[in-house]
């Protein structure tokens, strides 16, 4: 039935616009289980209440935890003939075969189907280096997409690294976000996105990220949809003397890390190390500096993280300085708790209040905290990793909108945005 729908949908798209390429993205692992379930049901219908009757109805809430558990064997599983048997007819109906978590088939299917064009339509973020090597090596593989680029509401906790007792893949309320590791729900880039940028050859300078020092020594329950929970910060007040794990991403043969001018050593990086080097030290405030070198020892780039200094205060930065009076235009206002040098404190959690008056209204207000009982429709919200985001909607009348942002112990900030 699914194959027939694939064919009909592809034909409809072609009829509407022959210039469009059509892709059908299939999870071979999930499709294999569905195919087996269908075969079993045809041969021996399950009795009501047996627990087997609804096997075919199980969705990502059932299959994703299995994928998280057996990830190390995924390449072997998707190479099974049954995966090919269950997908070849559907792929034959489209221009591009979208492989969800089936990178283990890229090479073999290039031999089995020489005319098939393949795209990695969904893949695990931690596998970007390995998958991109395949994209560059195999001419019939045209690209790779990661799940997921931008965080979203739903599949709660899919990508979260949880500290404490061992947690299931999906988390109960108050977890509300998937916690995707590339761009958080407020639009802030995370460390994983910079690793992707480096793997793709789009960034020459290295990138430094630090595992949360407030959880130093703890072992998190991990998800294969997140490669790291490190963040680009060397500001960890109250964590002096704790062991620090530092990740440096670099498209370079070697990378050297310095703490307050003292070398912590030089380690291999680049493609042979999946573009990542790991350093360990003891936290002390100051400056972390990473220097990348080519094979000849010549510097190719550097990155620096400094600790915040001075008293924390509110930093408010709107993405736009004016709005259209159309009732729809939005201003995204980034709010952060930072030192006098503008460096954000990731451990700063304060209740922020946003008041909006005039020719606009507060459309939404929140943070990237995946576990929160606060509402996006309220005018108060607690910062997460020192940040929050307010969204102001313009009205239909020209004028100005006044935005007041306040937090305990901080100077109140006021923005006035013209609405024209």
Region locations from a protein language model:
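Short, hydrophobic beta-strand segments
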Residues: 277-283, 377-396
């Amino acid at each position: 039935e699914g194959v027939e729908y694939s064919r009909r949908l592809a034909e409809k798209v072609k009829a509407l616009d022959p210039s469009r390429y059509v892709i059908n993205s299939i999870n071979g692992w999930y499709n294999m289980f569905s195919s087996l379930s269908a075969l079993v049901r045809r041969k021996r219908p399950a009795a009501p209440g047996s627990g087997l009757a609804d096997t075919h109805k199980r969705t990502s809430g059932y299959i994703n935890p299995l994928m998280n558990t057996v990830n190390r064997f995924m390449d072997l599983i998707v190479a099974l003939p049954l995966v090919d048997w269950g997908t070849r007819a559907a792929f034959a109906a489209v221009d591009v075969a979208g492989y969800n978590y089936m990178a283990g088939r890229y090479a073999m299917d290039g031999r089995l189907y020489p005319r098939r064009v393949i795209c990695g339509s969904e893949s695990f973020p931690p596998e970007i280096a390995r998958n991109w090597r395949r994209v560059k090596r195999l001419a019939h593989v045209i690209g790779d997409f990661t799940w997921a680029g931008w965080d979203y509401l739903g599949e709660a906790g899919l990508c979260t690294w949880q500290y404490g007792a061992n947690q299931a893949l999906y988390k109960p309320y108050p977890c509300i976000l998937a916690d995707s590791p590339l761009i958080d729900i407020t639009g802030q880039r995370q460390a994983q996105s910079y690793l992707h940028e480096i793997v793709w050859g789009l960034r020459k300078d290295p990138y430094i990220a630090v595992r949360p020092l407030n959880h130093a020594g703890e072992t998190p329950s991990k998800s294969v949809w997140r490669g790291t929970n490190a963040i680009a910060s060397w500001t960890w007040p109250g964590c002096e003397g704790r062991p620090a794990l530092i990740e440096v991403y670099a498209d370079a043969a070697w990378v050297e890390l310095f703490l307050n001018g003292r070398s912590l050593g030089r380690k291999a990086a680049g493609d042979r190390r999946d573009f990542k080097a790991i350093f360990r030290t003891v936290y002390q405030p100051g400056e972390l500096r990473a220097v990348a070198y080519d094979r000849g020892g010549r510097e190719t780039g550097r990155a620096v993280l400094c600790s915040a200094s001075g008293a924390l205060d509110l930093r408010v930065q709107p993405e736009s300085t004016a709005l259209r009076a159309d009732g729809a235009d939005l201003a995204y206002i980034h709010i952060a708790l930072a030192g006098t040098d503008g460096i954000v404190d990731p451990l700063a959690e304060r209740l922020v209040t946003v008041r909006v008056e005039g020719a606009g209204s507060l459309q939404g207000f929140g943070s990237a905290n995946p576990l929160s009982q606060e509402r996006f429709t309220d005018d108060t919200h607690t910062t997460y990793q020192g940040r929050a985001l307010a969204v102001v909607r313009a009205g239909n009348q020209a004028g100005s909108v006044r935005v007041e942002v306040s937090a305990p112990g901080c100077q109140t900030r006021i923005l006035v945005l013209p609405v024209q």
